A protein has these predicted regions:
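N-terminal secretory signal peptides that target proteins for export/translocation
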Residues: 1-15
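Serine/proline-rich low-complexity intrinsically disordered segments, especially terminal tails, linkers
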Residues: 11, 28-31, 115
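Functionally constrained cores in energy, signaling, and assembly domains
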Residues: 14-17, 31, 48-49
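Bacterial N-terminal signal peptides
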Residues: 18-29
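N-terminal soluble domains immediately following signal/targeting peptides that reside
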Residues: 34-204
């Protein structure tokens, strides 16, 4: 029975990923056409099993854009960058903590039993580096698109830690603020998008 369920999950996942790849390509192409400051690199994350009950996540993110989507998507991107770059450290840190909480609330594994394992312990760069990334993004936003300048992806780490062993086959969900995002494991690669926000994952 377990082998049958695993086979079904693999087939379902292949179908989901085919749609996800098409959606991701469409979204990225649209971004390149519609935005002079479209990111040069898509968001990405690498998963690695650290132990039977722990999986690490190493993200490479267009972090100012992600934080904009989490904290103030209704505000114009340039206005968001300017207002947040000028915040006092205490207020800035409070907003980043709010963003981390928002990301963690929508990032998790779902086990075959239906139980959830949250992706927690998000580690973002320190306040000074984050603030500088906002200022650089604002300068880039005001530059002619012909320059081809862009902000390099920012490294962010997180971890899924369970009290019991995490099964080999799980369902992964990440926040839509990260989409489209390329997910990499030692044995697989696939896209998650706003329209395909979940995937069945076979952890090594």
């Amino acid at each position: 029975m377990a082998q049958y369920l695993e086979l079904c999950s693999v087939v379902l996942n292949l179908l989901i990923r085919a749609v996800a790849i098409f959606a991701a390509a469409s979204l990225i192409s649209f971004a390149n056409i519609s935005s002079a400051q479209a990111p040069a690199h898509p968001n990405a994350v690498e998963l690695k099993r650290e132990s039977a009950s722990s999986v690490s996540f190493t993200f490479a993110l267009n972090l100012p854009q992600v934080l904009h989507q989490v904290l103030a998507p209704q505000v114009a991107y340039g206005s968001f960058l300017q207002s947040y770059a000028d915040l006092p450290d205490s207020a800035f840190d409070k907003e980043i903590a709010k963003a981390v909480k928002g990301l963690g609330a929508k990032a998790y594994f779902t086990l075959p039993s239906g139980a959830k394992v949250n992706i927690e312990k998000w580690q973002l760069p320190d306040t000074q580096l984050l603030r500088e990334s906002f200022k650089v993004s604002l300068r880039l936003l005001n530059m002619p698109p012909s320059t081809g300048s862009h902000l390099d992806p920012v490294s962010v780490r997180a971890q899924a830690q369970a009290k019991t062993p995490i099964s080999k086959v799980v369902q992964l969900q990440l926040p839509t603020a990260l989409h489209p995002i390329l997910v990499s494991l030692s044995n697989d690669k696939f896209w998650l998008t706003e329209h395909i926000p979940i995937a069945i994952v076979q952890l090594p």
